[in-house]
């Protein structure tokens, strides 16, 4: 990868993780809307936002080319399921007072990224990277052994998003066209659920306040912009390098949870956080050292 692509990847990764870091504040504004309904709005409005974006940028030719490759279309169905599951779990966690565990999941994610990079992409581990991954695993095992609890939400978020990044990197499609097809795969299910199954005080948009409907529609922008940045970064950077930036998002989430939303980390969570933070410190120092050697 050339220097220009790398610079673009870095900027896109920074933008993606910053927006994701402050995204919980948006979902807290609509905490009274069920998580599954918010997910359907994310899918529906993201699809229409992508249609508008592709129309403005005149990139429908790329969509036509993509539609001629059935293998990529079906792989995008897999990535759609992965990202849809990740979205649902994240929304539920934030609006059910598990923002700290959500942040833990995204602290773990860069370490899962380098693990998947080694297993599926042939990327080699350096010694310090091995140490970082081992410490992260130890943190989860200590929580399980000592406190009898397992960070299910954190692990679910970490692995679903890591596999999503891996699949998108293997498909190697342009960010916007890939996002359009992913939301197109999810659109029928989302529409059937929202308009045919969901029955809550907020599920009927015609009866909602205009302010609520605008917030629900904004889910498309909140979802699409950082995801486009991420998928753009994933095609320009090594998966292990991409993991380097992900501490930005969970750090912002952690600060939001503790400072603004009154979540207090228990002893079990703090043990795991401590291991993960040490692992990330080692990972970052190793990355900086390696970069300087180059």
From Swiss-Prot:
It is a multi-pass membrane protein. InterPro entries: EamA_dom (IPR000620), RarD (IPR004626). It is found in: Cell inner membrane. Coiled coil: none annotated. Residues 18-145 form the EamA domain. PANTHER family: ACYL-MALONYL CONDENSING ENZYME-RELATED (PTHR22911), SOLUTE CARRIER FAMILY 35 MEMBER G2-RELATED (PTHR22911:SF137). This is Protein RarD. It comes from Salmonella typhimurium (strain LT2 / SGSC1412 / ATCC 700720).
